[in-house]
């Protein structure tokens, strides 16, 4: 496989060193100095502050939309069937969430109000792929796509199921805290069967391979190596929730990252590591330096964060095997039962773990979050999961407004253009070499998809909290998916479903 030497100048383009940003810049500049297409357009966003991280454009423009695409970006006024005055507001590429587990209508609604136009399930993935895509066709508010999941393949093989309507790590059976698929070592024949499932998923258009060895401690190093070999052979991205977290070594986050980097080096696979802050905790800067070193030596590695100091997962998962307090540096009171918001005791921990359900884990240092957010190659992904009776982690509801409101406007940790790059362009660039449809996203230029977010930079903020997560973000004025409004005047638009599937096929 072709190799290259990555550098900071590459940012997050992965192997695509000559980014589509260059092409977008050329197209936009040529268009601005040429003849505008004739109107009227279906929709015109008039007089907004257009910010395009790909070209660096930051100025007042008028955007014309036709046939789901951006048809004009003009300094002169345009005529539209529907014209919306967006003066005083920022018009940016729609936000792309590479780590969205809440693949439901409710999840879409929360994310739309947070400015998201594309929500991808890339960590856990799903299976079978055709079933997963067909179940969402014509019903999605946002663009959608998924990897084929290693965990899902493990469930299928270890439970000897011939066919499942949909297998997903986000739909675990909670009746057994130690099912075979989590803790049992697979035989060579079973690993072969898993690889077969994954390969069929890739043929069906999955966006890559998703892995979560933290949830499958029975998966051997050989098993994971086989998955990395498959990703390299099929030339797709691998997404991974690393095997272990925390600062206690061996068996902590450095150990886990070394396993990932060794597999990348040995196979030539491209990898994206999810939520680096909840893996590294106080060691996050050290992990980022390891990733920098790997990239400088030609390995194709990227990562992400979510802007919260708490993680979330299933209480019955392998992450809470004995010794978790020492590994994570926390105690029972730092674990919050999502359904009620209560902090746990030893007694309630034992009771709820036997029942199964989501918890919020308060364990990420603010300094680790800021180190990742300011790092030039780290993008944003929510890791949002479905709420349970209105309870849960707020990251699936307020991630993007939180970045813009708290970390840009209020605390000035990063500037606005940098933030927009991390929440729109960078995820598109990371995927575009492997998924051609992503070349048309994350950018404002003629010919790009009309996935656009319009927000008030003076008002945008998250309102979702750990105690009350089911609260929409504020200041996201309009959101368009393929040129169709899904949010207008900060209200969800009823009876629209413009979301389109994103698969590896163009």
Predicted segment positions?
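Alpha-helix-loop-beta-strand connector modules within alpha/beta enzyme cores
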Residues: 139-144, 227-236, 240, 266
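N-terminal secretory signal peptides that target proteins for export/translocation
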Residues: 1-13
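Active-site neighborhoods of metal-dependent hydrolases
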Residues: 148, 154-221, 261-265, 269-416
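Active-site-adjacent beta->alpha loops and helix N-cap segments on the catalytic face
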Residues: 127-130, 218-224
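Histidine-centered catalytic micro-motifs
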Residues: 94-103, 213, 238-244
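Active-site microenvironment of metallo-dependent hydrolases
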Residues: 13, 21-61, 66, 75, ...
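Short, acidic/polar
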Residues: 103-109, 190-199, 256
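Metal-associated gating/positioning segment near the N- to mid-region
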Residues: 76-81, 85-139, 252
């Amino acid at each position: 496989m072709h190799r290259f030497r990555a550098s900071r100048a590459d940012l997050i383009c992965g192997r695509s060193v000559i980014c589509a940003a260059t092409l977008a810049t050329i197209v936009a500049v040529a268009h601005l100095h040429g003849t505008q297409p004739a109107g009227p357009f279906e929709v015109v966003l008039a007089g907004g502050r257009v910010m395009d991280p790909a070209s660096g454009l930051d100025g007042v423009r008028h955007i014309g939309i036709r046939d789901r695409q951006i048809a004009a970006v003009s300094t002169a006024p345009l005529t539209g069937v529907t014209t919306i005055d967006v003066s005083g507001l920022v018009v940016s590429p729609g936000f792309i969430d590479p780590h969205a587990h809440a693949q439901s209508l409710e999840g879409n609604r929360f994310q739309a109000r947070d400015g998201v136009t594309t929500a991808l399930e890339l960590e856990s993935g799903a299976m079978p792929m055709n079933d997963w895509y067909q179940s969402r066709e014509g019903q999605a508010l946002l663009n959608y796509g998924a990897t084929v999941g290693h965990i899902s393949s493990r469930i299928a093989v270890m439970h000897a199921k011939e066919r499942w309507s949909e297998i997903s790590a986000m739909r675990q059976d909670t009746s057994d805290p130690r099912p075979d698929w989590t803790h049992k070592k697979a035989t060579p024949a079973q690993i072969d069967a898993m690889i077969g499932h994954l390969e069929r998923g890739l043929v069906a258009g999955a966006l890559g391979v998703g892995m979560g060895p933290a949830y499958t401690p029975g998966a051997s190093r050989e098993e994971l190596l086989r998955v990395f070999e498959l990703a390299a052979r099929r030339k797709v991205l691998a997404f991974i929730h690393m095997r272990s977290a925390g600062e206690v070594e061996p068996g902590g986050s450095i150990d886990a990252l070394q396993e990932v980097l060794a597999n990348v080096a040995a196979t030539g696979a491209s990898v994206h590591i999810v939520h680096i802050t909840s893996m590294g905790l106080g060691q996050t800067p050290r992990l980022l330096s390891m990733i920098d070193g790997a990239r400088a030596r030609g390995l194709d590695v990227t990562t992400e964060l979510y802007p919260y100091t708490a993680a979330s997962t299933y209480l019955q998962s392998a992450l809470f095997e004995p010794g978790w307090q020492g590994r994570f540096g926390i105690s029972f009171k730092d674990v919050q039962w999502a359904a009620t918001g209560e902090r746990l005791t030893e007694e309630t921990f034992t009771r709820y773990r036997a029942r199964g359900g989501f918890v919020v884990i308060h364990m990420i240092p603010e300094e680790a979050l800021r180190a990742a957010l300011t790092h030039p190659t780290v993008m944003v992904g929510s890791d949002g999961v479905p709420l349970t009776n209105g309870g849960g982690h707020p990251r699936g509801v307020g991630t993007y407004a939180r970045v813009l409101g708290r970390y840009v406007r209020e605390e000035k940790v990063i500037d606005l253009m940098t933030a927009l790059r991390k929440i729109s362009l960078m995820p598109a660039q990371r995927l575009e070499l492997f998924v051609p449809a992503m070349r048309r996203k994350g950018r404002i230029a003629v010919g790009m998809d009309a996935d656009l977010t319009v927000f008030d930079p003076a008002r945008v903020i998250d309102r979702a909290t750990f105690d009350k997560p089911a609260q929409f973000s504020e200041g996201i004025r309009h959101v368009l998916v393929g040129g169709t409004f899904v949010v207008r005047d900060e209200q969800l638009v009823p009876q629209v479903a413009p979301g389109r599937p994103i698969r590896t096929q163009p």
